[in-house]
Amino acid sequence: MDDKQHTSSSDDERAEIATSNQDQQTNSSKRVHLKRWQFISILIGTILITAVITVVAYIFINQKINGLNKTDQANLNKIENVYKILNSDYYKKQSSDKLSKAAIDGMVKELKDPYSEYLTKEQTKSFNEGVSGDFVGIGAEMQKKNDQIMVTSPMKGSPAERAGIRPKDVITKVNGKSIKGKALDEVVKDVRGKENTEVTLTVQRGSEEKDVKIKREKIHVKSVEYKKKGKVGVITINKFQNDTSGELKDAVLKAHKDGLKKIVLDLRNNPGGLLDEAVKMANIFIDKGKTVVKLEKGKDTEAIQTSNDALKEAKDMDISILVNEGSASASEVFTGALKDYNKAKVYGSKTFGKGVVQTTREFKDGSLLKYTEMKWLTPDGHYIHGKGIKPDVTIDTPKYQSLNVIPNTKTFKVGDDDKNIKTIKIGLSALGYKVDNESTQFDQALENQVKAFQQTNKLEVTGEFNKETNNKFTELLVEKANKHDDVLDKLINILK
């Protein structure tokens, strides 16, 4: 995420689904325990840290409980011997901590898994701050994928969203410095800072790059928001955190009190959160004893089921779920369950597609290992990783909200032929200017509209689409997108 990690979290970061040992102990009557894994924190995306063990203890436990075959023991001995040799006999003095970290980093890197990572004590501290719920940053959920830092989704109402950051944007620089090769936590640390200070992100969208300046703010992730729109209740769920299920229940009861029979659960750009909450939330609409999600590792499968009767006030409601490519992790668990049981109709666009689960181990020295341990499936056995969940009814996002960033290092004028010129035309049309085609040609008609745009916005009137014009153009499109929710409006019209 900014600010959080999901392993995608928020700053980034990515969505998460988690069950903690503590939660399992205090809520044992309401949860199906994971047999072999019941003492391990399970995460999808952002991680909830619970187990604290030393490296020595970890090795001992594995030897004692699981056992090591001769090959494994030989490999472990080899690693130990190499460490001792380099630490004591290398001609230059070596840091034992750095050697240890390098060995662990090498093993994790060999997994070729963007969700597995080893964090130092400092990185773990930053990580913990990121998943606390309150932080100073830009409010952008991010993940590391293919050695790139990618935005999973900007949080609703966050500085990142207001600045135009979108899902799947790739961050290449922070304050002009390349982040190539940096760990997710390091990037998070760079993006964060003091309240009311600014950070400049270089964003790559498609083949183009653009600098985006964002003011850091104190971010508080509010779980659920309810609004009445005519005869439809719109419940926006921003994240799956502690007591989100309680907030959702309250919102549903409020809608019932308002006499509403149709409910929209808006999960767009929801990066996920706690698995327990996703199960409890599904239980509001799904009866007791039903499987909400299946966790699978090898040949072992464990079903997590609902433990209570469905909320009676919700039984007669017509439920619609609205999703997009920023809906990930727990959002997909919840959506997949209601879809499989025909409790809701899904609208919007295909979801992110994250169907693997991470486990964390925090060591005594404060460092932490996060690794993928299993995958999850919907009640009907659908594996959505890399595929996402397709909506029952597609509602396309307006063209202007899906445009690539136009590089502000280029100037376009009459006679030019470039794909970005099509973007200019679509954007100007969305802003109310008369554009009669969407070609890649910068013609006289477009020059006239650019001049009109410049004059209206008190810019130098040149007819050329330069840096200043581009910046204002982008600002107004972002403002329009934030003020007018075309997708939600279309859905409400469908439900009338």
Swiss-Prot record:
Membrane topology reported for the UniProt record: Single-pass membrane protein
Chain intervals for the UniProt region annotation (Disordered): 1-27
PROSITE patterns: PDZ (PS50106)
UniProt subcellular location: Cell membrane
Positions with biased composition (Polar residues): 18-27
PDZ domain span: 124-206
Annotated coiled-coil segments of the chain: none
Gene Ontology CC annotation, any one: plasma membrane
Recorded family membership: Belongs to the peptidase S41A family.
Protein name per UniProt: Probable CtpA-like serine protease
Organism: Staphylococcus aureus (strain bovine RF122 / ET3-1)
